[in-house]
Amino acid sequence: MDSKTFAIITDVHSNVESLKHSISIINERENIDQIICLGDCFALGPDPINTLKLLKTLPNCIFIRGNHDRYLLEKLWTQERPNLEGMSPDDPLCQAIVANEEWTANELGDAGVDFCSAMRIAYREIIGNTLVEFTHAWYQRDDQPPSMDEALAWRNHVAVAHPEIEQYIFIHGHVHIPRNETKENFIACPSHISVFSCRYSRR
């Protein structure tokens, strides 16, 4: 049996207490093969500094960049009329988010920039005849996951180079709500602020 167990953390948004709890769950498990963080680590939360410190303690964790991590790198707040995720620049909610992005960046300083700069856009593993793809929302855009039609088109493209693959699993964060969609040999399953482990096997 080919198998691998993943612990997945995503969309922490500086909720350091939830992150501590997630790490405690991981530490209680003896069979975790890989920890993956799906991004949006710092903005929109109260404690980016201690969040960064905790994330740095995760052994061999793969960090994937979320849209809010990208905003930090792009210095979204320096744009003349910054907007995000389809919001109007005049929307008070958009303005509040942009202000929080700036505050978060100031709290983290260069250490936060370096950390986010080292993040990946996506990560892929092949376990037996199963391909598992991890990303924040999608490799083509980090602020909206793919529709099922888009995901199947991606699967068909990948299948050309990997004819041996029998099952595709696409794991993303960003949405903060459950999504478990299956079609043919494709499964889309997001996660949110908590942590869970996944096991994929071929007998």
Regions found by a protein language model. Give the residues of each.
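Active-site neighborhood of divalent metal-dependent phosphoester bond hydrolases
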Residues: 58-123, 151-160, 165-166
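Active-site neighborhood of phospho(di)ester-bond hydrolases with catalytic His/Asp-centered motifs
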Residues: 9-10, 35-40, 62-67, 135, ...
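N-terminal active-site segment of His-dependent metallophosphoesterases
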Residues: 1-60
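Active-site environment of divalent metal-dependent phosphoester hydrolases
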Residues: 13-18, 43-46, 69-73, 141, ...
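Beta-strand-turn-beta hairpins that frame and shape the catalytic cleft
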Residues: 1-7, 124-133, 183-186
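Conserved beta-sheet core of the metallophosphoesterase superfamily
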Residues: 149-203
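Short loop/turn motifs at secondary-structure junctions
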Residues: 31-32, 131, 166
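Internal, conserved structured core segments that host functional sites
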Residues: 114-147
